[in-house]
């Protein structure tokens, strides 16, 4: 309570004066929806007064001149798998703080499937040493896959009981609709534990309408970020949800989702907020982060006030953290953006946790990553593969086999459909066929629990030769590899195993590009600009193999997600995401045994 007393005394005009004062700016008050002249007094990391702050200024108060500029709250990303950026939290802070993002809401689920709650605790302790804030949602369970795939840690009801008291915990996160539909016992227990701790349920229900939505709403879900059409978003809004607009690096929904405002006449703008879900460094550095979403919304005709609310207070209210962040108000964390022009919305300076963190798009404070635990640096535990392992056997007598290929297209981001193809058979093995745009895909379980490494086929990557592979691949972070040549695929996979994770391109027996991701096999401490350069080189190397997708590695690494229809690929094999079963690529109309082995 000593801190509370200290803030009360400072805010009440006592002897303690403001440590920082932001003076001369025009305040964008997202609560009262006004813009007016006001100064802001900050004591340590908290706002203590707004308006006339003359009595709070002392001889040691640092004055920040904001004359002729606007003051807006720091922005909040309402749903983000931050590890999918491949940046550690320290490096991610370097990427987004200069762009005005001062808070993110994340389940840290990708590091949890690798190292469990201890790994998440390491990440949360790490971010405390930066000006960025992480509000943590305890994943409803991990993995999210159905049927359940193999991961390093299964986040269970016991984990919920053990972590809900963490100060960063704000809810039950990524509550996948299928878990509610199937009455998954672990998830229902997690919700009950959360209810006992007064924590909200945060959703994940793409393409959910009608009776399915009604059933899903019985879980008490408060917010959802997965609307594929404005009609779907409107139905969820009418059902009582806070709706979160997603604009990620790979899926661009903002322009379509916000038609509920610009074309469908929705007035409840305070129930609409922003998230980016999955972003990569090259996209952040080229387009921006939440600042880009604000500009996009205004370009559609949304008012500056409403667009800024969507990036700040609306998300805070949806997550029930508006007493901490989301507005420039007494008692809130001192996260303030200084903006020259609201419509241009370029961030001139960022005050985060009461100190200037960035100016003119650059960090002005030095962020140093922590020493990493040995467990996170040695998380890839599988044995090497051979080219002979990457095969789909065929016992028939015909020279061709009818198979199901998991098809991806840039027109339907995330959605994987079925493509029936006829492939050649040689020596009892079904071969991929580049002339038909069909490649091999395999997922190698990398935690040393099994010898699972099923092989199937994908279509849409258009690889003419070589292979691409990644050990960061939500929701399991098992090694996924796509290729035209089994030998190159084996080299790619084994390179990741030998280096404890990363992303790699191999062609004609040679590693042509490699990004090392040593922390849990999924993230790195390198700076955002260096990461962006690696991403561009990796994607360009994939394009030289023939891939013409806009983000080759992102299209590959989401193939393990079973919460999005119609098909996925996990360490159990091909998943029919609609009927929640494993199927054989040779028998797409019926279930088949998974090609799995127990580890010896």
UniProtKB/Swiss-Prot annotation:
What domain of life does the UniProt record list for this protein's source?
A: Bacteria
* Record's keyword terms, sorted: Hydrolase, Manganese, Plasmid
Iron-sulfur in keyword set: no
Q: Identify the enzyme class.
A: hydrolase
Q: Does the keyword Plastid apply?
A: no
The record's similarity note reads: Belongs to the metallo-dependent hydrolases superfamily. Adenine deaminase family.
Return the protein name. Adenine deaminase 4
Cofactor(s) recorded in Swiss-Prot or TrEMBL: Mn(2+)
- Xref: CDD domains: AdeC
List the catalysed reactions. Answer: adenine + H2O + H(+) = hypoxanthine + NH4(+)
The EC number(s) this enzyme carries: 3.5.4.2
InterPro entries given in the database record? Adenine_deam, Adenine_deam_C, Amidohydro-rel, Metal-dep_hydrolase_composite, Metal_Hydrolase
The Gene Ontology terms for molecular function here are: adenine deaminase activity
Q: A Gene Ontology biological process annotation?
A: adenine catabolic process
Identify the SUPFAM superfamilies for this entry.
Composite domain of metallo-dependent hydrolases (SSF51338), Metallo-dependent hydrolases (SSF51556)
């Amino acid at each position: 309570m000593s801190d509370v007393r200290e803030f009360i005394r400072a805010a009440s005009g006592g002897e303690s004066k403001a440590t920082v004062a932001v003076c001369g700016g025009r305040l964008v008050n997202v609560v009262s929806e006004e813009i007016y002249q006001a100064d802001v007094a900050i004591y340590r990391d908290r706002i203590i007064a707004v308006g006339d702050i003359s009595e709070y200024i002392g001889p040691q108060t640092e004055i920040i001149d904001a004359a002729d500029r606007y003051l807006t709250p720091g922005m909040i990303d309402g749903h983000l798998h931050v590890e999918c950026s491949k940046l550690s939290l320290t490096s991610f802070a370097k990427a987004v703080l200069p762009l005005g993002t001062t808070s993110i809401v994340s389940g840290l689920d990708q590091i949890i499937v690798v190292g469990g709650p201890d790994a998440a605790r390491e990440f949360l302790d790490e971010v405390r040493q930066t000006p960025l804030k992480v509000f943590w949602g305890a994943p409803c369970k991990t993995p999210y896959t159905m049927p359940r795939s193999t991961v390093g840690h299964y986040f269970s009801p016991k984990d919920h009981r053990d972590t809900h008291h963490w100060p960063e915990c704000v809810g039950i996160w990524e509550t996948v609709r299928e878990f509610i539909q199937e009455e998954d016992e672990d998830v229902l227990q997690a919700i009950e534990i959360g209810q006992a701790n007064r924590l909200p349920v945060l959703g994940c229900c793409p393409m959910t309408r009608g009776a399915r939505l009604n059933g899903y709403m019985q879980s008490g879900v408060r917010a959802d970020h997965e609307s594929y059409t404005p009609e779907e978003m409107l139905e969820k809004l009418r059902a009582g949800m806070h709706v979160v607009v997603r604009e990620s690096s790979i899926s661009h929904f903002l322009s379509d989702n916000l038609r509920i405002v610009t074309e469908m006449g929705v007035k409840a703008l305070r129930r609409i907020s922003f998230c980016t879900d999955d972003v990569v460094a090259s996209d952040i550095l080229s387009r921006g982060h939440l600042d880009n979403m604000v500009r996009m919304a205004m370009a559609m005709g949304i008012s500056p006030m409403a667009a800024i609310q969507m990036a700040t207070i609306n998300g805070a209210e949806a997550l029930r953290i508006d007493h901490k962040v989301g507005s420039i108000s007494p008692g809130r964390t001192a996260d303030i953006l200084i903006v020259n022009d609201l419509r241009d919305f370029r961030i001139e300076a960022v005050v985060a946790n009461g100190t200037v963190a960035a100016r003119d798009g650059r960090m002005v404070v030095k962020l140093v990553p922590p020493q990493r635990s040995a467990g996170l640096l040695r998380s890839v535990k599988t044995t090497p593969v051979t080219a002979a392992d990457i095969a789909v056997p065929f016992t028939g007598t015909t020279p061709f086999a009818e198979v199901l290929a998991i098809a991806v297209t840039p027109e339907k981001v995330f959605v994987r459909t079925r493509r029936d193809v006829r492939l050649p058979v040689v020596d009892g093995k079904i071969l991929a066929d580049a002339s038909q745009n069909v490649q091999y895909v395999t997922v190698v379980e990398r935690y040393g629990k099994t010898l699972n490494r099923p092989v199937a086929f994908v279509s849409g990557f258009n690889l003419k030769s070589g292979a691409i592979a990644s050990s960061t691949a939500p929701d399991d972070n098992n090694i996924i590899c796509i290729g035209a040549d089994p030998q190159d695929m084996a080299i790619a996979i084994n390179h990741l195993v030998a280096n404890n994770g990363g992303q790699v391109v191999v062609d004609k027996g040679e590693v042509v590009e490699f990004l090392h991701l040593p922390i849990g096999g999924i993230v790195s401490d390198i700076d955002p600009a260096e990461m962006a350069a690696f991403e561009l080189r990796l994607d360009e190397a994939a394009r030289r193999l023939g891939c013409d997708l806009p983000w080759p590695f992102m299209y590959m690494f989401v193939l393990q997600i079973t919460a999005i229809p119609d098909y996925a690929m996990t360490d159990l094999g091909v998943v029919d995401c609609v009927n929640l079963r494993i199927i054989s690529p040779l028998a797409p109309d019926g279930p088949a045994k998974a090609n799995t082995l127990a580890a010896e």
